[in-house]
Structure formats: structure tokens, C-alpha cells
A protein has these predicted regions:
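Conserved small/polar residues in nucleotide/adenosyl-binding loops
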Residues: 163-170
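Hydrophobic/aromatic-rich structural module bridging two neighboring secondary-structure elements via a short loop
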Residues: 61-87
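N-terminal membrane topogenic signal
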Residues: 1-11
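Alpha-helical transmembrane segments of multi-pass membrane proteins
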Residues: 11-26
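Transmembrane alpha-helix/helix-exit interface in multi-pass inner-membrane proteins
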Residues: 82-103, 128-156
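Loop-to-helix transition at the N-terminal end of transmembrane alpha-helices
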Residues: 32-49
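Membrane-interface helix termini and inter-helical loops of multi-pass transporters
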Residues: 26-33, 99-102
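Membrane-interface interhelical connector segments
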Residues: 96-121, 157-159
Length: 175
């Protein structure tokens, strides 16, 4: 392990340690998360998914960051994607049981909110299949587009926001 690996582990410990050592911090986190789900989705995805991408870069290239990788733009994009994922979870977890009732399943909404049973498992599986077939392809396409955009902008947040696509007269598209 290199020095950067110990630093990465140290950052993870600093992020998660307060939740284990302080009941009041953990209680505050749970109440803030319940009251401000979208804000917390942005923060959690922004931090954790970006750390995951950095870990992936470490595995594939041997470093946690490099020129053009764009840690900050990736964190912003992941934060926005996290908000979309949160919205999709809400929409599908509420909408699919309603749709199942519309299609003839009795009490799907009550079942998904009740004790575990095989019908609840069936509803949960249906929610998962619906979300992964309807939402996931759009999500993955958008994520690929944003990754490409970040790389095209050299990983700079300012460049990502002010980037204009090349015009055919620039000669960039004909190469």
C-alpha cells in the first residue's frame, strides 16, 4: 500500500467515524436525512460515488486522481444523479404498487407497507424490474454523456459549465 492509500482510508474513517462515536450526530443525520431527502441525496451521492470513481481509477491506473479526471465536476454530476435516483425510487416505489392494483392485484399498496410475505417480495421485485428497465438505461446514458463531457473539458468545473461544442468549421468534427 502506498501513502495515498493510507490517506484515502483516513478520509473514509473521518467521514464515517462521527456516526459511530456520537449518538447525537447520528440522530441529527437521520432527522436531517428524513427532512431533506433531496439535499442529502446530492451530498451522499456526490461524496460516496465520487470516492468510488476515485477508487476505480486507483485500481485501473494506480492513482486516485489525475489531470483531466475532474473530481469536483464528477461530485457535482453524481450529486445531481443522486437526486434523480432518489426521485426515481420515490416514483417507482409508490407508482408500481398503484399500477399493480390497477392491473388487478388486491391491496398491493398495503402489502408493500406491511409485514414480509411472498406478495411483498413479488411487489418489490416488480418495482426493481420496472425501475431497472425504464429508468436505468436513461440514467446510464446520461451518466456516460456527463463523463465524456467532463473529460472533454479537461476536468475543470469552470470549463464544464462554459463549454461550447465545436462547430464543423473548426475542423474538429472532420478528424
Amino acid at each position: 500500500m502506498k501513502k495515498q492509500d493510507f490517506l484515502f482510508i483516513f478520509v473514509l474513517v473521518i467521514i464515517f467515524l462521527p456516526f459511530f462515536v456520537s449518538e447525537s450526530i447520528y440522530d441529527w443525520y437521520k432527522s436531517f436525512n428524513a427532512a431533506h431527502g433531496m439535499v442529502m441525496s446530492f451530498i451522499k451521492f456526490g461524496i460516496l460515488a465520487t470516492l468510488g470513481e476515485m477508487l476505480g481509477l486507483r485500481i485501473s491506473a494506480g492513482v486516485y486522481n489525475r489531470k483531466g479526471f475532474g473530481v469536483l465536476p464528477r461530485a457535482v454530476v453524481w450529486g445531481l444523479l443522486g437526486m434523480g435516483i432518489n426521485a426515481a425510487m420515490i416514483i417507482f416505489s409508490k407508482g408500481v404498487p398503484q399500477f399493480m392494483e390497477y392491473m388487478g392485484m388486491a391491496n398491493a399498496v398495503a402489502i408493500i407497507n406491511g409485514e414480509f410475505c411472498l406478495d411483498k417480495l413479488w411487489i418489490a421485485l416488480t418495482i426493481s424490474v420496472a425501475m431497472n428497465t425504464i429508468f436505468a438505461p436513461v440514467f446510464m446514458t446520461f451518466h456516460k454523456i456527463t463523463d465524456t463531457h467532463i473529460l472533454m473539458c479537461g476536468g475543470s468545473l469552470k470549463s464544464c459549465l462554459l463549454y461550447t461544442s465545436p462547430s464543423p468549421r473548426d475542423g474538429l468534427l472532420s478528424r
